[in-house]
Amino acid sequence: MKKLLLSLWALSLTTFVFAAEHTAFSPDKRLHLTVRDDGGQPTYTLNYNGLEVIKPSKLGLKADYGDFTQGMKIVEATEKAVQTVYDMTRTKRAHVDQKATMLTLKLVNDKGYPLQITFYIANNDVAYRYTLLPVKDENPRCAVIYGETSSFNFPDETRTFMTPQIQPMSGWQRTKPSYEEEFVPDARLTDKSKYGVGYTFPCLFRIPNKGNNTWILISETGTSSYPGCRLSEYEPTKGYHIAYPQAGENNGFGSEFASIPLPSSTPWRTITVGNSLQPIVETTIPYDVVEPLYTTQNDYKPGRYTWSWILWMDESCNYEDQKKFIDVAATMGYEYILVDALWDKQIGRKGIEALANYAKSKGVSLMLWYNSNGTENDAPQGPRNIMSNSIARKRDMAWMKQLGVKAIKVDFFGGDKQETLQLFQDILSDANEYGLQVIFHGCTLPRGWERMYPNFIANEAALASENVYFTEYFARQEAFQLTLYPFTRNAVAAFDWGGILMNHHMSKDNKSRHQRFTGDIFEMATAITNQCSVNCVALTPNALEGLPDFEKEWLKQVPTTWKDLRFLAGYPGKHFAVARQTTEGKWYAAAISAEEQPISMTLHLPMFAGKEVKVYADGPKKAGSLWLTPGMKRQKIGKNGLLKVIVQPRGGVIVNE
């Protein structure tokens, strides 16, 4: 017996010296993280409810002064319980109170240089990041990170819901990559991406397990002046690894690597896990591990805006047409109008000043469009060469503040390099000094920015509403996209889809070109299913005239800021239902479908139990009609809070008091 105990002690000692292993659990014990340094290669595994959802996956990075991917040894481990409490106004949940386990590991490489890895483990979320610590003699004081071995290795049967990255300086006016490629649902791990250069965040995975599914969402957060990363192509037995920007982005200018001071941390890589899609839709991990980077004295207002360009295009950016859309905003009680590209030539600064005064007389404020650059791509629309230059940028921001302009939309970034991510931060910081909120388009995914920057509204970072106008193909895809984004793009950040489209045809006259294929209630429901604190309602003057009164009245009070949410039902790219509570306490439930046949859904709505509600729904098409038939009725909800609804193909349902 004594010999056996001695052998076990010796084995334990050997394991500690050559293959240290550390485990940590989520507060509810369902997530189980294990980190090892076996063979000098740090790896982690992740189990959820006893199922290995991420197989052994590599950790580590390579810097100019040291290799932290091999010859590594864990020399110190600390674990503590943490509680994250904060309030926000521009995301899916206004108050967050999150408990988690924090595991901090200190490793050294074969030269004795230190690397810290911090894991944040909540009930359905894991986040981790690296911190390069000072070396013993405090030199070097700065470093370049060339890449990471950080990987995500899934079971072989896993299915994917991802959108590919594309080669740089491609597409219209060499503006790509701009995070505007098509998602492919339920693909196999071994399927190659369309362009062969990996995938942009966020990335959704489904692990089938004896008739049940485990869902995993991978993304990153806390990126400010660091490159935006992505997932590589899949490698059998190894999985996906973190990839840095492509060298050709920004017309080849700037490094694809990360330049940092020491000590310094990378962004957090986030993993959300659940046996249903509820944790995916409701996660707050992008905000839980970041902090505000500056405060503000400005009172930034949420709201709704009208936008002529989405249906009337470039030629509408003139003084008279913009007045018409100001009038629409005023009629509907909306706070803003977006004056889009080419205003510098087609309206002029004096014209903008006159428009600002006219809008002010109607209780409406302007938002102005800007090109982000003049050197990174060939997008011709102006104003150009302003937002990329600090002197010109501040000059225009001071002018806008004087006019009462409340926000800017900055477009055509086309890259993830460190200098581009720094430009986002610089624009936001300067805009805050002049009381301006900011929307970014043609650009990367926001990574925790709603909490980091108090004047940030949203990014596009997906195929958005303009494509519904451009081609009939994308018009037919609209329902698919908008039932997919709640589980992917909008799950990790506010999303400027860019327009609740009420025109029946994608044209100024509302009679020509291809039709809209979704129902009116579907479009209205996207104000609930999509989350963005300043939301576009793409009403045109002629579409407004033809709206039924019940639609018009609902659109007048469409909410944009939320206190809470509850996932109700859905499957990515097929259907989605959610309930959201406004900051004033009023609940709205909405369901949309991309299915080819009507679907029956039983919604659990305890907030409406025993109450009379209004149910807005798209009904079947009438004989000879191209469009679903919208309607509204009052209905009493039973004490059990259950409501059975029929959702038409490309149709929607809304429930509110």
PLM regions and their residue ranges:
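Aromatic- and carboxylate-enriched substrate-binding clefts and catalytic-loop regions
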Residues: 338-519
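Bacterial Sec-dependent N-terminal signal peptides
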Residues: 1-21
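Conserved, mostly hydrophobic/aromatic
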Residues: 130, 329, 411, 438, ...
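C-terminal beta-strand-rich structural cap/linker in extracellular carbohydrate-active enzymes
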Residues: 633-657
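An acidic-aromatic substrate-binding cleft motif
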Residues: 257-336
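Carbohydrate-binding surface patches
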Residues: 571-609, 653-654
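Glycine-rich, aromatic-lined ligand/substrate-binding cores of catalytic
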Residues: 508-583
